[in-house]
Amino acid sequence: MSSKKETKVTKVTNHRLDICNKTLYQITNLKTAIIHNNLEDFFHTFTSISNLCYEFDDQVNIMEDPNSLWYSSSTMIDCLHNIEEGIFSNNLFSTVCNIYTLECMVNTAMDSIDKES
């Protein structure tokens, strides 16, 4: 008989990276809602992104990670507010610029996260 040892590899989820990925997905949903002029989806997605911003803040505070770059949730919420203002004032340029800014914030945060932790 051969005795084989089974080892279980437990992958630890990087919650911050997971939140960033969810946020990027929601930003895509936000774009789709705007393109299809669906305000119900827009506000649902808007709320989801807001919640993810606060959730990420909580994760950074729990982890006490000084190396993780993240724009504060208030900065992200301000950006969302600017998107909302652009929508209601029919300012497509402002809306697109602010969505791009929001996307850049999340991508920058993702790049600063250690993918192995």
Residue ranges of predicted features:
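Long, low-complexity or tandemly repetitive, helically biased scaffold regions used
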Residues: 15, 21-117
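Short Lys/Arg-rich cationic patches that frequently serve as NLS/NoLS or arginine-rich RNA/DNA-binding motifs
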Residues: 1-10
